[in-house]
Amino acid sequence: MKNSLLLVLSAIVLVFTGCKNGQKAEKDSENPFFSAYTTPFQVPPFDKIDTSHYLPAFVEGMKQHDAEIAAITDNTEAPTFENTILAFDKSGELLTRVSKVFFNVNEANTNEQMQEIAKKVSPLLSKHNDDISMNARLFERIKALYEKRGESGMDAQQVRVIEKYFRDFERQGANLPKDKQDQLRKINEQLSMLSINFGDNLLAETNKNFQLVIDNKADLDGLPESVVTAAAETAKNAGNDGKWMFTLSKPSLIPFLQYAKNRDLREKIYRGYFMRGNNDNANDNKKVVADMVRLRAEKALLLGFDNFAAYTIAENMAKTPANVSSFLDKLMVAAIPVAKKELAEMQKIADLEGATFKLQSWDWWFYAEKLRKQKYDLDENELKPYFSLTNVRDGMFAVAGKLYGITFNKLTDLPVYHNDVETFEVKEADGSHLGILYLDYYPRESKGGGAWCTDFLSSGWKDNKKVDPIISIVCNFTPPTGDMPALLNWDETSTLFHEFGHALHGLFTQGKYTRTAGNVPQDYVELPSQVMENWAGEPEVLRMYAKHYKTGEVIPDVLINKIQNSGLFNQGFDNVEYIAASVLDIDYHLLSPPAIVDVISFEKESMAKIGLIGEIWPRYRSTYFAHIFDGGYGAGYYVYLWAAVLDADAFDYFKQSGDIFNQDLAKSFRINCLTECGNDDGMVQYKKFRGQEPSLDPLLKKRGLK
């Protein structure tokens, strides 16, 4: 692997050194990454960025970063905060610039060229990062400042940055002997490539390798007209005019599972979904998973930890895997009986309809929808006309406006990476510029599944001037069809509010230092996002944005009451499938080398251990668990539930005040939990807002588990 890495690097260098100096200078001047953007608000000039620009920018970015590090280590003066920590904190500007654009676009609008570049550059970046984190001279300077941090006259934030960097270097192998560092380098390089492979395989399995094509209209029985229309359009775009096509993207999959009366076809598409990455083909992820689990276990041992879970969670609010497992066990004990009750109620419906079968996992959505209608007289298709994407978007903007006084102005003249993307300027109450927000709503073959929030430029400071953030929300919502706008179901509505919470976190965060500005423990990260979901379903808020897309009629109270009454609907299923996935994640990362051989057998044993009922699969099975194998959540998928305790407690604080838009609480939450969130430990910052540690009771009540 090391030799191939050198060959790749040599080939890249030859490409550029083979040009005459004049030609190279001309090429450099044409590369948008090689100078500060001249676009409005410093947004990436997507209209000028070509795929050919990425590799040269990565190579030059690493070269410049190396020079910046050398300037620090070659400094003959004694280490100070300014000549070591601050210099390091500000280094790597070009590399960061190209990395943010490349990896964000590769997730949201990829192609074969981008994927090949990712495979080339990932090992180079792994080596580059290891060269820095294992740089003995750099670590010596940081260590010297760390050891004198209490007597140097530095302020609290400077001390915190020093402590963070010192801990980072320790956790990345700076204290290891040379032979152990070489082992760690090899592991990091392999893990970076395996993660790329996992994501590429999953993208192909989800977007290319399965389609359910229907040519008999009778097989569409039960499906809403909007779903049928969308399926016809999908088929037409794929060259199957006159037929109907369903895919594994959630806007296509979930409605089919909810409404299609053809049970055999429900099973077929569901199996297509839960067998992703497990089909013994070129995109099979079983060996990728096994190798990643083994390598992570080896990495943890090298760094002095019993397992990768201990290594990861040590930096989180939970502190230890035992605390996480205890937390998950308590919730599973509460959730399993609720799920079993839901299953019994659905089986009763099926039996009364003359079913001669025991419900299976592919039946859950179909009979859950029937149960919702029976218990709450609530039909999701009755709701969707009130939740057009535009109205939901404007609703979340209005909530942020009432809480924080900010406004969102749509812009049409900024370059974007895809024509579907919308752009907004975000302003403070006084009219000053706060940041830019991109919104990318719809599925496409070039986009990964799910929803996420990222940034093209983080908030910070440069040359004593504030750098304003550029935030992006990426989703996979049901697209518009014909004259019908994009209509969201309740899950999609909650998802948009969720990702918007992340966006607000990115917009509001401030700090002098890159290492601490907005950087919080992983099990705190979902607090800003999940707390926003609470506002989406409040009656006062629903009346602000839930309006019929045809008539403009505000959602009637009868429907609001149904939404409120059905708040506990399907909570057993939702909680059990999530907890099961979290347990699977932790179990993988509690392993010691040589870890596992048979991924599927291990998965079955893990689920049997917690008593998972056969009708529910974990939310993500091993071979498509992108969060932990391609998303930075290894040994950390539990964090959504951990943060749910915080978000339920935080919103309960607003409710107790008698005003969900309480301005004093909103100001305190913004300052302590969003703007200054990286200034201290996560719980310390939360307690500054709440006045006490969070209680588990609001979450249990919210989810019907108490």
Map each language-model feature to its residues.
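C-terminal motif of bacterial Sec signal peptides marking the signal peptidase cleavage site
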Residues: 15-18
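Active-site-proximal, well-structured secondary-structure segments within enzyme catalytic domains
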Residues: 157, 161, 200, 204-247, ...
